[in-house]
Amino acid sequence: MKWPAEFEPDNSSVYARNEIAIAAPPERVWRWLIRAAKWPEWYSNSANVNFSRGNPPDLAPDTEFRWKTFGATVLSRVIVFEPPRELGWDAHGMLSAYHGWLIEPDGGGGCRVITEECQNGLVPKLAWWYLRPMLERGHQNWVESLKRVAEGGDPS
């Protein structure tokens, strides 16, 4: 995972990691993951995805988007975009965060998906004990939902 210097896991107040095996090719998983405008249709912890820079519905390098997740509205910018392997964006709102995704082929036509997030700022520093398990649960929902849709076919 490519981490921005300010979000190295060892130097962050909150760090969460989730992983799942998906019986779908990395390219298909990638297409679902970058189609951010459609996240609310299959990932219940996202809403109101609006692009302020970029070409909806898909993320691309330097795309900026505002969205609601975990009950908070955040502004994000894509800073890592390496199809179909790695995607990452920062997030700013009541905290600063970096959320990265890694898609690794499994050699059998499927892939392993790893998602990691680091958070910094006053809120994560004070509430790390609450935020970490919340992120892990929310991101587990995300990877399980990604598995379900990707194994079902390509996005429309």
Walk through the language-model features, giving the residues of each:
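Hydrophobic ligand-binding cavity/cleft-lining segments
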Residues: M1-G54
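Short beta-edge strand/loop motif at the mouth of beta-sheet-based domains
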Residues: R17, A37-T73, F81-E86
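Hydrophobic/aromatic beta-strand elements that line small-molecule binding cavities or substrate pockets
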Residues: N18-I20, L75-V80, Y98-P105
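Short strand-connecting beta-turns/loops that link adjacent beta-strands
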Residues: P25, F70-A72, P83-P84, M94-L95, ...
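Hydrophobic pocket/interface hotspot
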Residues: R28-L33, W39, F65, V78, ...
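Short, highly charged C-terminal tails/helix-capping segments
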Residues: N50-F51, K147-S156
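Beta-strand/loop substructures that line and gate deep hydrophobic ligand-binding cavities in soluble
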Residues: A91-R148
